[in-house]
From Swiss-Prot:
UniProt source species: Ictalurus punctatus
Predominant subcellular localization, coarse grouping: secreted
The keyword Cell membrane is assigned to this record: no
Function: Somatostatin inhibits the release of somatotropin.
Family, similarity comment: Belongs to the somatostatin family.
Disulfide bonds: C94-C105
Pfam families (alphabetical): Somatostatin
Top-level taxonomy: Eukaryota, Metazoa, Chordata, Craniata, Vertebrata
Keywords: Cleavage on pair of basic residues, Disulfide bond, Glycoprotein, Hormone, Secreted, Signal
Protein name listed in UniProt: Somatostatin-2
Length: 105
């Protein structure tokens, strides 16, 4: 019976520590500076502008897109050649043993 109060106390301590970590987290400015240092971007240097989804949609709808031209495949690739699968005349009563990879006549 002593294990259930012990488990309850342990669960409460875990809950309190999790709430403490969440509520006492680092301020936003400290986190941003740490992230900039990790990306090797000097503090104070301008980061490229980030656009929202509606702004991007507006920009794309107002710009006329040029059609993409498909480039020809490089000539270094081997071109596929269809094999001539015409029916060859076989002698009568020839048996094809496909599991043996041969034909017996």
């Amino acid at each position: 019976m002593s294990s259930s109060p012990l488990r309850l106390a342990l669960a409460l301590m875990c809950l309190v520590s999790a709430v403490g970590v969440i509520s006492c987290g680092r301020p936003h400015v400290v986190l941003n500076s740490a992230l900039e240092e990790a990306r090797n971007v000097p503090f104070g240097e301008e980061v490229p502008e980030r656009l929202t989804l509606p702004e991007l949609q507006w920009m794309l709808s107002n710009n006329e897109l040029t059609p993409v031209q498909v480039e020809e495949a490089p000539r270094s690739r081997l071109e596929l050649v269809r094999r001539d699968n015409t029916v060859t005349s076989k002698p009568l009563n020839c048996m094809n043993y496909f599991w043996k990879s041969r034909t017996a006549c």
